[in-house]
Amino acid sequence: YKNQEYGLDWNEVHERYARRITSDMTWENLFEVLSDMVNELRDGHVNLSSSLATSQYREWFDSYPRNFSDSIQSIYLGKDYTNSSGLTYSILENNIGYIYCSSFSNGIGDGNLDQTLNKLAICDGLIIDVRNNGGGNLTTAQKLAARFTNEKMLVGYMCHKTGPGHSDFSEPK
């Protein structure tokens, strides 16, 4: 995919960065080289982590078009809002419910979701604002979306790495 979309030849990247790695380099230098290599993917969802540091490709977020302003949100919400399990919610003018979900990284508890939706059930409309959401756990996003349909629906496929080989992945499920 990366080769088709971006012209990235991962084998060439591997060869180029392998030349920079030596047996006597420090842990910090090795981490820096590997971080640079992983950043070639230009993917904000790929990180290199250790007990001492985390490297991430921030440009995807920093260069993302800004379509969200905390100050505008504070004008609409004022101080009359509730935070519950990663959700910020309130009832706006004209009896419109508003839920802001800034991340799917943390789980949303069923009880918290029940409380949020029960409070907003009296509303004439509902806005679910996921602008500036950095992503996270697909299960969390599915849990929120499932509250708005009675039908089971396919939302995507997942594959898992199953071995050290280049193409060692599970079947899409």
Q: Which residues make up each language-model segment?
A:
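Flexible, low-complexity junctional segments that flank or bridge functional domains
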Residues: Y1-K173
